[in-house]
Amino acid sequence: MIRIVIKASVLAVLAACLALGQTSKPSPKPAASFVGQWKVGLGIGSETFTITLEKDGKATKSHGDPNGKWTMFGDEARISWDDGWHDAIRKAGNHYEKAAYAPGKSFTDPPDNITGATRTEPL
């Protein structure tokens, strides 16, 4: 009888831990939190440019080839530009940053530069 009570107690504790773990996971950022205009660093000195992320997945920028597409991946917005560059905008502590990846690299490679990113205007 004691074995049955111990097994039931262990199962109850495991079930409670599993339920607690599922409810305490952070939810991914909604795409709406990234839609809008972003002022980001170019990665050269203090130069900046603007990235615009639209609700339909279209992305434009004020530097280089202006066209691209973006999607959410976890908690970051990933942008693939027609010129081969890739950018990721993500929360880093209490601010946002833009990580840039040169043509031929993927988002799993180390970025070529990381600069600040500030949303200047929601759409």
Q: What function would you assign to each model-found segment?
A:
Residues 1-10:
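Bacterial N-terminal signal peptides that target proteins for export
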Residues 12-21:
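Hydrophobic h-region of N-terminal signal peptides that target proteins for export
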Residues 23-26, 74, 102-123:
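Edge beta-strand at a domain terminus
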Residues 24-39, 50-56:
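N-terminal helix-cap/turn-to-beta initiation motif at the start of protein domains
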Residues 36, 97-98:
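Conserved glycine-centered beta-strand/turn positions repeated across beta-sheet architectures
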Residues 40-87, 101:
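N-terminal glycine/threonine-rich, aromatic-flanked beta-hairpin/loop signature
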Residues 88-95:
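Extended Gly/Ser/Thr-rich low-complexity repeat segments
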